[in-house]
Amino acid sequence: VWLIGLMQGVTQTPLCIDSPNAKLLARILEEGHVARPGMVNSVNEEGDKCETIFPLIAGTPWHVVGLTCDRDGIPADPEKKIDIAKRIIDKADKYGVALNQLHIDPCVMAIATMPTSMKDFERCIRGIHEYAPTVKVTGAISNISFDMPARKYVNMNCMAYAIAAGLDSAIMDPCNMDMIGTIYACEALTMKDTGGKNILRAYRQGRFGVKK
């Protein structure tokens, strides 16, 4: 709690409150420690986390991350991940949480141990959007490159494939110019940035590319 106060003293950026302890997250929400609602990270289908957090953020500006895991852990089968996501989405809707404030994280696995990870990630993105088009899908992109050489190339290509599949956001370093360039390029290529206005503006602002 002391860290929340410290951070709010130096930035106007909404905070992401991160803890595996749902009761701690609930306490922070109930006691009003956060001045500018940001994101709660996270809920899942293990225990009663959804039931604890969703009633507290319903009707508020808070966003929330939902992990596709349950009491048995993270399933390897993408269809099981999608089923968990559906249960989280249904509970969010039941408690009145706006679905466009729910961000499902399909828990990206490393290709070093699960070669189908990229294909599975794409399947999850599409499957979640098919079930609930307004729900956001996010993911920790760098998870996919654990134990791989020159990890940034794996990460950049993972980002490209994921955006093409419909990824809405990513857990990543926002100062990584290579990844920022990949995002802008993919949005132009997939017609999310029609005419390339955003990529041109970002390049001129020095957000990616060679610094002059």
List each model region and its residues:
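Catalytic alpha/beta core domains of metabolic enzymes, predominantly
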Residues: G59-F208
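Phosphate/diphosphate-binding loops
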Residues: P20, H33-T52, I88
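Glycoside hydrolase catalytic-domain context in secreted enzymes
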Residues: G9, L29, H33-R36, K49-P75
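Conserved beta-strand positions in the central sheet of alpha/beta enzyme cores
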Residues: C16, M39-N41, V65-G66, I171
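Long amphipathic alpha-helical segments
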Residues: K211-K212
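Alpha-helix-loop-beta-strand connector modules within alpha/beta enzyme cores
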Residues: V1-A35, M118-G139
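Glycine-rich beta-to-alpha transition loops that act as phosphate-gripper elements at the mouths
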Residues: C16-L24, V43-D48, A140-F146, K152-Y153
